Every structure is written in C-alpha cells, then in structure tokens.
Curated annotation (Swiss-Prot):
The lineage of its organism: Eukaryota, Metazoa, Chordata, Craniata, Vertebrata. Acetylated within its nuclear localization sequence, which impacts subcellular localization. Proteolytic processed by CAPN1 in a calcium-dependent manner. Cleavage from 31 kDa precursor to 18 kDa biologically active molecules. Glycans are attached at N46, N139. The gene is Il1a. SMART domains: IL1 (SM00125). The keyword Nucleus applies. This is Interleukin-1 alpha. It holds the Pfam family IL1. It comes from Rattus norvegicus. Cytokine constitutively present intracellularly in nearly all resting non-hematopoietic cells that plays an important role in inflammation and bridges the innate and adaptive immune systems. After binding to its receptor IL1R1 together with its accessory protein IL1RAP, forms the high affinity interleukin-1 receptor complex. Signaling involves the recruitment of adapter molecules such as MYD88, IRAK1 or IRAK4. In turn, mediates the activation of NF-kappa-B and the three MAPK pathways p38, p42/p44 and JNK pathways.
C-alpha cells in the first residue's frame, strides 16, 4: 500500500528552511551596513558644533544649497534629516569656506560676505599704457555740463551759461593683464593733478590730488580705475572698485556712482 504524503510535514519543513534563510539574511544585514549608508548611530551632542569628515563610519553634516530670490540658503543636517543650522547668503556676492563653517555657530542669520564685491578687482595690477584723450568735455543725456563744485573736491552737473567753467578731462589707458574685453582708464581734470575717484553707491565722486600720474595702480587705489565702454555715441564709465556702479548724474546735482535710473549713466564726449 502506497504511503500518502504528509502535507503538513512538507509545509513544516518548508517553513523551517525559510526561517533559517530569513535568519541568515537578518544576521547578514545586522553585521554589514549598506554601501550607500553614509552614517549610522545617534548624533552625539558633542559633534553638533563641529564638521567631521564624510566617512561611512562617522556621523556627518551635509551642506545643501537652495536658490530662491537671489539668495543661497545653506543648511546643516543630521543623519536623520533634521535641520540643525541654517544660514542665508547673498547669491550675487562671493562667500568663503569660513562662511560655511560659521553655520555651526548661529541658528540662522544673514552672512555679510567677508569679501567685498570689489576685493577681487583690488588684487589686479593696472599698468599705465598711454594717454588716449586730452582736454575733452563730457555732457550727460540732458546735455548738462560737468564742472568743479564750489568745494573743489567734487564734480557737479548743470547747464552752464559760462562754458569756461566746464571741466576738461584727460583720459589715461591702463592694462591689467586680465579681461581683454574691458578698457581700464583714469580720468584727470586737465592741467591739474586731480583724478576722479569712486566712493560708493549714490556717493559723489571725489577729486583726489595725486602728485604725478600713477604708473601702477593696485589695491585700494583701484577707486581711480573706470572701465570705459562706448556704444554708438554714448560713453559709459563703470567703476573697477564697485563693478555694478557707473559714473552718473542727475539734474543739477553732484556727479556720483549709480546703477542706472533715476540717475543718468551715459555721456557724450567731445
């Protein structure tokens, strides 16, 4: 008489084999971390204020950048995804590694970049090439004349009846060995040693007296350098010290630096 198979015994054996296999897999997973698991274990209090190297056996902080409204948000997160620190940086200004490390010290604040926008320009060396224009006059888009203000250290724009008061300029060309698309120049009041000097946004340009025409301009002296650009009959002078600002005028006001309207930033030269 043939033996009837014991179905319950087969199911029991199958269950036992699967249990052993499952136990082996569980044991393996407990003793081997995934290759992609950058960190594990709890985040210790003593490392919340420090940056540590990114190794698979250590807890680390990750810096993430999100771009929104011309801002950079830098976040430090734990291995559990919790945001520990957050800082905002201006997107259009440079920031350094020190700025990133500073995340660990403040919960949230706006970083004032340690490098001013013109700091890179200050590292350039401008060498005198030659004089390119002599005794020329500048008129703005309202056809106002440029003349020396009563304080003798500023320039002013207005419509003059006596054109003898109108300032004449000399222009000197320089070479920086940098961007060939830019044309660095200095502007000097003719027959004087007064050079036009940039002072900042909406601030009047200063007439700085220099004993002789500078042959080499570096560092803080880059306030004397302007990038001359000519488009058709319009001339523009962008400050090397303040790269987003140009020499500008308003109606009957001192010559200053501005980004554009309501100031006028184009000039006619004759």
């Amino acid at each position: 008489m043939a033996k009837v198979p014991d179905l319950f015994e087969d199911l029991k054996n199958c269950y036992s084999e699967n249990e052993e296999y499952s136990s082996a897999i569980d044991h393996l997973s407990l003793n081997q971390k995934s290759f992609y698991d950058a960190s594990y274990g709890s985040l210790h209090e003593n490392c919340t204020d420090k940056f540590v190297s990114l190794r698979t056996s250590e807890t680390s902080k990750m810096s993430t950048f999100t771009f929104k409204e011309s801002r950079v948000v830098v976040s430090a997160t734990s291995n559990k995804g919790k945001i520990l620190k957050k800082r905002r940086l201006s997107f259009n200004q440079p920031f350094t590694e020190d700025d990133l490390e500073a995340i660990a010290h403040d919960l949230e604040e706006t970083i004032q970049p340690r490098s001013a926008p013109h700091s890179f320009q200050n590292n350039l060396r401008y060498k005198l090439i030659r004089i390119v224009k002599q005794e020329f006059i500048m008129n703005d888009s309202l056809n106002q004349n440029i003349y020396v203000d009563m304080d003798r250290i500023h320039l002013k724009a207005a419509s003059l009846n006596d054109l003898q008061l109108e300032v004449k300029f000399d222009m000197y060309a320089y070479s920086s060995g940098g961007d060939d698309s830019k044309y660095p120049v200095t502007l000097k009041v003719s027959n004087t040693q007064l050079f036009v000097s940039a002072q900042g946004e909406d601030k009047p340009v200063l007439l700085k007296e220099i004993p002789e025409t500078p042959k080499l301009i570096t560092g803080s002296e880059t306030d004397l350098i302007f990038f001359w650009e000519k488009i058709n009959s319009k001339n523009y002078f962008t400050s090397a010290a303040f790269p987003e600002l140009l020499i500008a005028t308003k109606e009957q006001s001192q010559v200053h630096l501005a980004r554009g309207l309501p100031s006028m930033i184009d000039f006619q030269i004759s």
